[in-house]
Structure formats: structure tokens, C-alpha cells
Amino acid sequence: MLEQNIKKVLYSEEEIIVKTKELGAQLTKDYAGKNPLLVGVLKGSVPFMAELMKHIDTHIEIDFMVVSSYHGGTTSSGEVKILKDVDTNIENRDVIFIEDIIDTGRTLKYLRDMFKYRQANSVRIATLFDKPEGRVVDIDADYVCYKVPNEFIVGFGLDYAENYRNLPYVGVLKEDVYSK
């Protein structure tokens, strides 16, 4: 049923898991003995973060934030709103934001700057997908699984109007679905 709205599959579940394992190995190496705090940016980060955690072989803690700059549409409103903040004190902590996709970059730039202000020891960004063509602010992720074209993609946590997050793969949504 959902597949009928997908123009093409970009990455299969198996391909995503392979990249996530590679990233987990890199984070294990980079954070050995440091107990970093992984902060998932809800809701889209859930499948990626759940898969990634299985492949990090060092102590970690997790927390979550609900942050929005889209408010249900396909384009960023430009205004970042924190709907749920972390519960963990991040002062002197190594923080890794876990995100499904970086598009405009507004949300993660805002969060990175805020956590630096709150005196985190370090702030890094790990994203499943990076869409550099969509960037409107100067920010880059420290860890990127895939760079993607400037197309509207869904699946593996990525949504359109809260739908399609449950697809096990990532695909391009047909334009007629979101241009109605």
C-alpha cells in the first residue's frame, strides 16, 4: 500500500544497516572510554538511533529531544522550536546528536550552539542522511552515512506528514503525493 507512493528506492534496509554498523565502529573508536551522551532528535531519529546503538561497543547514555522547524509541511518554517528538552545535565559531557537527515541545517545549528552555551565538553552530529543542497546555514555533520540528492525522501524514520516513517528502506516520494 505505501509502496505505491514511492517513485524509487534509494537505500535498502540491508544497505542502511551496513552503513550504520560502519558508523557504530567509528563511534566506538572515537569515544572509547568516554561514555558519550547520544541525543536522538525525535521522531525521525528513532530507527537510526536504535540500529546504531547496537553497533557501538563502548558505554553510552541516551536522551531525546523533540525539536521542530517543519510543523507538518515539506519546507522548513525557519523557526526552531524545542518541544521537549533533554533530561540529562550535559555540562562537561561529550554529546552526539543523532539525526535522520540534515536538510536546511537550522535545527542542528541551533542545537549545537545551545549545547555549547550549556558547556558541553564536545558536540558532534551523526546523521543517516545529509542533503547539502538544502543547506541554508553553515553547518556540517561530523558523521554521515549517506549524502542524498535534493529530493523528498521517506522511510526508516523519515516522514511526510507523519506517514512513511515505518518503511524499512528509504525511497523518493512521488511528487503528486506532497504537491496536492
From Swiss-Prot:
Residues reported in the UniProt entry to bind diphosphate:
43-44, 165
Entry's Gene Ontology BP terms: GMP salvage; guanine salvage; hypoxanthine metabolic process; IMP salvage; purine ribonucleoside salvage
Q: Which cofactor does it need?
A: Mg(2+)
Q: What class of enzyme is it?
A: transferase
Q: In which pathway does it act?
A: Purine metabolism; IMP biosynthesis via salvage pathway; IMP from hypoxanthine: step 1/1; Purine metabolism; GMP biosynthesis via salvage pathway; GMP from guanine: step 1/1
EC nos: 2.4.2.8
User: Where is it chiefly localized?
Assistant: cytoplasm
- What name has this protein been given in UniProt? Hypoxanthine-guanine phosphoribosyltransferase
The record lists the lineage as:
Bacteria, Bacillati, Bacillota, Bacilli, Lactobacillales
